[in-house]
């Protein structure tokens, strides 16, 4: 009799520990991605351009929905967004200091700062639980990934922005600050602000024309999810390795992402 009670209690505990559906958010850094620096090269008469790169961890975050309705397999849908910052500057002939480019793109969660390469992806995964132990659920799986990547602020992109002679003249005028008195420097600061707004709009217009670079790939994953009985909160950790997908030529994708987070589970 006691043995039957133990079995019934264990079954109840397992049922309450595994949620049918859950939604959560997570920290999602990407590892191993590199962006090569671009050599300084002419983009207009008397103006050159160069950009830096990055090597290491791309910061990121994401959201996840999981469904445990199927008897053997579970389903996850995940959207991650990651970004890496790099330097970019214009070099005007006869001017000692470069003119840094600070880009503020509408529709991205970043303010005015160094340019950023932003990579995002929508994953649809099927996972297989390795055990059915109550409270904790390790699993393996894989699925399809829809990649969306932004442009890199490279030579050809900048060339398309400042091909207007009026823009080139604004850049040359705003960059030259040598030998100016305080009043003239204040005027230059106003010119730089106007130039920044003009370049911002130019970048946004060209970015809208180019759009996001999209492609299809896949991924494999290993992870674990934990949920206490009764309490409608779960924690999870996934490691994903991606394959396929197209990136700008300057970017060497590391293809590895860690997801650590939690959410509501019913």
Question: Where are the regions a protein language model picked out?
Answer:
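Cleavable N-terminal export/targeting peptides
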Residues: 1-20, 170-196
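Short glycine/proline- and aromatic-enriched beta-strand/turn motifs that initiate or cap beta-hairpins
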Residues: 18-70, 265
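Gram-negative (and chloroplast) outer-membrane scaffold detector with strong preference
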Residues: 29, 64-164, 229-231, 266
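Outer-membrane beta-barrel and related beta-rich outer-membrane complex signature
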Residues: 35-39, 87-95, 150-160, 201-210, ...
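Predominantly the C-terminal beta-signal and adjacent terminal strand-loop region
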Residues: 36, 86, 178, 195, ...
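Residues that define the transmembrane beta-barrel architecture of outer-membrane proteins
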Residues: 45, 55-61, 116-122, 136, ...
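Extracellular loop and loop/strand-boundary signature of outer-membrane beta-barrel proteins
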Residues: 45-52, 107-115, 204-210, 244-250
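Alpha-helix-centered segments that form part of catalytic cores
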Residues: 61, 195-220
């Amino acid at each position: 009799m006691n043995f039957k009670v133990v079995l019934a209690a264990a079954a109840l505990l397992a049922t309450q520990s595994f949620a049918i559906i859950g939604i959560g958010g997570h920290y999602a850094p990407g590892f191993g991605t590199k962006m090569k620096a671009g050599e300084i090269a002419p983009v207009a008469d008397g103006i050159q351009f160069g950009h830096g790169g990055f090597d290491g961890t791309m910061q990121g975050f994401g959201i996840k929905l999981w469904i445990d309705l199927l008897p053997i397999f579970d389903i996850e849908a995940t959207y991650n967004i990651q970004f890496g910052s790099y330097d970019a500057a214009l070099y005007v002939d006869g001017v000692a200091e470069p003119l840094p480019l600070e880009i503020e793109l509408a529709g991205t969660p970043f303010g005015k700062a160094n340019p950023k390469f932003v990579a995002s992806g929508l994953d649809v995964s099927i996972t297989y639980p390795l055990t059915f132990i109550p409270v904790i659920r390790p699993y393996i799986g894989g699925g399809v990934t829809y990649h969306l990547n932004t442009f890199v602020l490279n030579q050809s992109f900048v060339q398309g922005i400042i091909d207007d002679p009026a823009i080139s003249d604004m850049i040359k005028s705003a960059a030259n600050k040598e030998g100016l008195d305080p009043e003239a420097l204040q005027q230059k600061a106003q010119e730089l602000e106007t130039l920044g707004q003009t370049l911002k709009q130019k970048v946004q217009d060209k970015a809208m024309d180019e759009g996001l670079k999209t492609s299809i790939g896949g991924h494999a994953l290993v992870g674990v999810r934990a949920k206490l009985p009764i309490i409608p909160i779960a924690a999870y950790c996934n490691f994903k390795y991606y394959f396929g997908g197209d990136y700008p030529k300057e970017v060497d994708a590391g293809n590895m992402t860690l997801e650590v987070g939690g959410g509501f589970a019913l």
